[in-house]
A protein has these predicted regions:
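Glycine-centered hinge/linker elements that transmit conformational signals in sensory
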Residues: 188-189, 227-260
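Hinge/lid segment of periplasmic solute-binding proteins
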Residues: 96-159, 183, 302, 306
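Conserved N-terminal structural module of periplasmic/extracytoplasmic solute-binding proteins
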Residues: 6, 19-106, 122-128, 175, ...
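Extracytoplasmic/periplasmic substrate-recognition and gating elements
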Residues: 54, 58, 63, 81-82, ...
């Protein structure tokens, strides 16, 4: 797992973003603008990005120099440091290298609020009229709480608890709608040698914990918790959250922590597919990510997905909506053309390309843009996953608020990564909570905005 960029390096990068970088236009000598686009290559594949860039050039005449890589930070980090930043970057938060988070903290992103008011190239609607409600009103897209949007929402994916629907049908088990029902099911599964829970890596606890906050205390508790409000971790809602996390750790497969890393996380995902564990937190990308592994299964298997259970009977279950982000570096040389490219990402043409491009392995890309009406165009597993909000679950969005850089303190290290130790038994829930309280005091004192 890559180390987070040192603060010294970040400082150098920030200087590179602003020092001597007056806007310029890159051209090929004949007046034609060329922008540099850098996109992380994930399970969605790189082919879709090539096609979107081609479609953008055909529509606008602006050429695109595309870079895709599974370790994109290794490429663009030095570029940003050397005052040669790409014009558009698709790189979400939550990556081990933490590059996007570091640039947020360093005020290294270009304001995209103007893009929302732009007409989508080749269409008549504005970008703001295409994007589904709520996606540009979160702390992910508006990290500074200043009413401005700095990151464009991309490739949304409802997150929840994934399970083997065939196993539940064979056992006659009902998917729990409350945590009490979850614990009861955990005992039944334990009696048959099946763990109740596993997780790919502790980082997957982000969407899980956000949805849990909503299910316990709604938006009010979520907002206070994610802004590190004084005394929030001593409230009854927080105590309920920590009790659930502690109890769930005891129901988690014992091999999970050792395999919860970038090399072995698929082994934890296979636990659910091979009936060694019932549930895992994940997103809709899991189907494509494990498509080849599914072909090798010897047991009956079909994907199932449910929201996190309600705390009490009759309460609401929540499914966190994860989405990736695209952004324009503050040091980009072609901001006007870059803004056109970002606007084009929400065109009907781009939406179709992202969703239905054939990858190198023969599967479809399946990247869903957060635009209105997209669920009506889906079928199969995706129809099931993206209709979760039509089946009673409520949507949870947002994340921990950005704060100024603090040595050795970030939200992943404080809230998510310690789950491995909690499951392994090397960290008690009391120690976990105490560490959160200490770190939250620092985060609150250094909040941005």
């Amino acid at each position: 797992m890559k180390k987070i960029l040192s603060f010294a390096l970040v400082a150098i990068m920030v200087l590179g973003l602003f020092a001597g970088c007056t806007p310029a236009t890159t051209n090929d000598g004949d007046g034609e603008v060329t922008i540099k686009v850098a996109a992380i290559e994930t399970a969605y594949g790189a082919e879709m990005w090539k096609k979107v860039c081609e479609a953008f050039t055909a529509q606008t005449g602006i050429k695109v120099e595309l870079t895709t890589d599974k370790n994109l930070e290794d490429i663009i980090g030095p570029q940003i440091q050397g005052n040669n930043a790409p014009d558009v970057v698709h790189l979400a938060t939550g990556r081990p290298a933490g590059l996007t988070e570091q640039l947020i903290k360093a005020n290294g992103l270009h304001d995209l609020t103007n893009v929302l008011n732009m007409v989508v190239p080749g269409e008549t609607k504005k970008v703001s009229d295409k994007i589904a409600g709520g996606f540009t009103d979160t702390s992910l897209t508006n990290p500074y709480s200043d009413g401005k949007t700095y990151m464009a929402p991309m490739f949304y994916s409802p997150c929840g608890l994934f399970y083997n629907a065939k196993l539940f049908a064979a056992k006659g088990w009902t998917v729990p709608t409350t945590w009490d029902e979850m614990w009861t099911l955990g005992e039944k599964a334990k009696a048959e040698g099946i763990a109740l829970f596993t997780y790919p890596t502790a980082g997957y606890y982000d969407a899980f914990m956000y949805a849990l906050m909503y299910s316990i205390g709604g938006a009010e508790f979520f907002d206070k918790a994610t802004h590190y409000a004084e005394g929030i971790w001593d409230t009854e809602e927080a105590k309920t959250m920590f009790n659930i996390l502690d109890k769930l750790a005891g129901y988690t497969h014992e091999k999970t922590p050792a395999q919860a890393n970038n090399e072995d996380f698929t082994k934890n995902q296979l636990m659910v597919m091979q009936d060694e564990a019932l549930f895992m937190p994940n997103g809709t990308w899991i189907v494509g990510e494990m498509a080849e592994a599914q072909k090798t299964l010897t047991n009956d298997f079909a994907w199932g997905m449910t929201a996190l259970p309600a705390v009490k009977a009759g309460g609401a279950g929540y499914s966190y909506t994860w989405f990736e982000q695209a952004w324009i570096p503050a040091g980009a040389q072609n901001k006007a053309a870059a803004e056109q490219f970002v606007a084009f990402l929400y065109s009907d043409k781009a939406v179709e390309i992202f969703a239905k491009t054939e990858k190198a392995d023969g599967n479809l890309s399946g990247a869903m843009q957060p635009v209105l009406g997209i669920a009506d165009k889906l079928e199969g597993d995706n129809k099931l996953f993206y209709s979760i909000y039509d089946n009673g679950a409520k949507a949870a969005m947002g994340n921990f608020a950005a704060f100024n850089a603090i040595p050795d303190v970030d939200t992943s290290k404080v809230f998510f990564e310690p789950i491995d130790k909690l499951v392994a038994g090397s960290l008690t829930i009391e120690e976990y909570v105490a560490n959160i309280k200490t770190a939250s005091d620092l985060m609150r004192a250094n909040l941005k905005g």
